[in-house]
């Protein structure tokens, strides 16, 4: 081969290109000849949850700072499902608004369920979605059952496709199955689901329960969906009736037992929602303990489902980590920090910090009592001290903002030093303007920088100055009134105050 490369390099290249072209041709031709199955999902999120006593859909009630619907959407996206249809109902516009704000990985559409007439009726509203994806499989699950996970979804789909099932029910084994539908198994799969109130004494002993999560062959589901009848006391259309109809048509039905013991859990009232929060909090902290993260005390600690934490990091009491937050390695997250949708680098030390939608680079020290408002970027090695607020600003490498300072709408260079009490005056009552402070500048105590203004490289501002014009590189700017001294002024003021006091209260007796 080496000789060929030496004497016929161009021919080798031609042969290689021909092989790559042939491979693309054969692979492309093969794919055109087969049907690629889509795996899509319908999420039922139309419930009101009257016992929650809230004016929002139940699926938007929070578990560890995230709507239950978000937990479900995240699981579906992590399972790499294709398209998602959310069935909305009560206060459906709130569902629309939430999805519009969300950065989704999958394509998401919504349909409206005007009347809440059961789970089967909810799925009927998504009939057009089902017909558009009739060649694949469809997962149906509740938007207010937050503990469904990607591993369960993928495991159930694998069983569903391997056994060529018309329907596969996701189930769980629990110690106390009270209130849940029981799974009736046969040698070839399952024969049905019996609701708790309809169970015989023998069926009540069954501990395998229905999670309310189902994989259907989409075409099979469409075949029976509109055959279900509201023949029950509630006058509702039950999706579970589709299982019996499919079995009656000779379709195979089976059940996948999830390793997740909480997969079926939901909440109907505030007590139930609090219980879900406690479970989620305990499970997530346990996961990070297993990853080697040190928790000095778990009191008040809350970590969101989408948070990641690097090795060697220490978490103290009262810490709340929410949203798409990433904490790097060997960090110290001190007491009472709230970090939301923020990226934190390695070796960062935070103490009583609130940070929202910001970036904190490596080896930064912040706190105590610091707020980073959205779009703040603190670069490597910077130090932000007590009682500082930063908003929509970049703080350069190794810059020090020691205390009692407001920096808003500013671009700050590296190795800048801020004295105590500096304010970037960014708002004139109508518009906001930016302040630029270049590398190695020194901003004296109680300086007001009235934007738009630029402080040049290496420039100084004298303490107490109000800066309204640009400062050249390496210059000193002093903008304050000259000090005036009035001799004897205090004695005159004291005499006047004494006379006024005596006129009101009388002359004091001399001792």
State where each predicted segment sits.
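Structural signal for interior beta-strand "rungs" in well-ordered beta-sheet cores
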Residues: 294-478, 483-484
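Conserved N-terminal catalytic core of the sugar/cofactor nucleotidyltransferase
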Residues: 30-40, 66-141, 147-158, 162, ...
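Short catalytic helix/loop segments, enriched in acidic residues and glycine
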Residues: 55-71
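Short, positively charged and aromatic/hydrophobic N-terminal segments
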Residues: 6, 12-14, 20-29, 33-34
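Conserved alpha/beta core of the MobA/IspD/sugar-nucleotide pyrophosphorylase nucleotidyltransferase superfamily
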Residues: 207-310
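Conserved core of the sugar-phosphate nucleotidyltransferase
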Residues: 93, 148-233, 240
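N-terminal nucleotide-binding beta1-loop-alpha1 segment
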Residues: 37-54
């Amino acid at each position: 081969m080496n000789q060929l490369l030496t004497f016929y390099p161009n021919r080798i290249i031609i042969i290689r290109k021909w092989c790559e072209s042939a491979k693309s041709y054969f692979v492309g031709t093969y794919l055109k000849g087969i049907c690629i199955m889509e795996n899509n999902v319908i999420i039922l999120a139309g419930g009101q949850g009257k016992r929650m006593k809230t004016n929002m859909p139940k699926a938007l009630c929070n578990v560890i700072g995230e709507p239950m619907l978000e937990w479900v959407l995240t699981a579906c996206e992590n399972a790499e499902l294709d398209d998602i249809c959310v069935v909305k109902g009560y206060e459906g516009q709130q569902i629309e608004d939430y999805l519009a704000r969300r950065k989704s990985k999958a394509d998401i559409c919504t349909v409206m369920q005007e009347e809440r007439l059961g789970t089967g009726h909810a799925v009927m509203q998504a009939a057009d979605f089902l017909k558009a994806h009739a060649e694949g499989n469809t997962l149906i699950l509740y938007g207010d059952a937050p503990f469904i996970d990607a591993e369960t979804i993928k495991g159930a789909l694998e069983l569903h496709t391997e056994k060529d099932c018309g329907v596969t029910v996701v189930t769980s084994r629990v110690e106390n199955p009270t209130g849940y539908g029981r799974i009736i198994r046969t040698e070839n799969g399952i024969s049905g689901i019996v609701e708790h109130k309809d169970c015989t004494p023998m069926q009540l002993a069954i501990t395998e329960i229905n999670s309310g999560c189902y994989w259907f062959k989409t075409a099979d589901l469409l075949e029976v969906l509109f055959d279900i009848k509201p023949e029950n006391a509630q006058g509702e259309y039950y999706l579970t009736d589709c299982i019996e109809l499919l079995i009656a048509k000779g379709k195979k039905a089976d059940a996948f037992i999830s390793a997740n013991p909480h997969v079926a859990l939901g909440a109907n009232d505030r007590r139930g929602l609090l219980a879900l929060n406690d479970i989620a909090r305990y499970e997530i902290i346990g996961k990070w303990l297993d990853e080697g993260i040190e928790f000095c005390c778990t009191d008040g600690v809350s970590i969101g489902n989408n948070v990641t934490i690097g090795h060697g990091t220490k978490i103290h009491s009262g810490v709340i980590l929410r949203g798409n937050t990433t904490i790097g390695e060997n960090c110290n997250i001190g007491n009472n920090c709230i970090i939301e949708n923020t990226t934190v680098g390695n070796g960062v030390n935070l103490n009583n910090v609130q940070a929202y939608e910001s970036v904190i680079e490596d080896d930064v020290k912040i706190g105590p009592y610091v707020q980073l408002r959205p779009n703040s970027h603190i670069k490597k090695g910077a130090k932000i001290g007590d009682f500082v607020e930063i908003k929509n600003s970049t703080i350069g490498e190794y810059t020090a903002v020691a205390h009692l300072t407001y920096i808003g709408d500013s671009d700050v260079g590296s190795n800048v030093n801020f004295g105590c009490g500096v304010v970037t005056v960014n708002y004139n009552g109508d518009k906001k303007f930016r302040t630029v402070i270049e590398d190695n500048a020194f901003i004296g105590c109680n300086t007001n920088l009235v934007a738009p203004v630029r402080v040049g490289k290496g420039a100084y501002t004298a303490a107490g100055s109000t800066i309204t014009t640009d400062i050249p590189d390496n210059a000193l700017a002093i903008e304050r009134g000259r000090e005036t001294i009035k001799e004897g002024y205090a004695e005159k003021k004291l005499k006047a105050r004494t006379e006024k006091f005596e006129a009101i209260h009388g002359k004091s007796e001399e001792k």
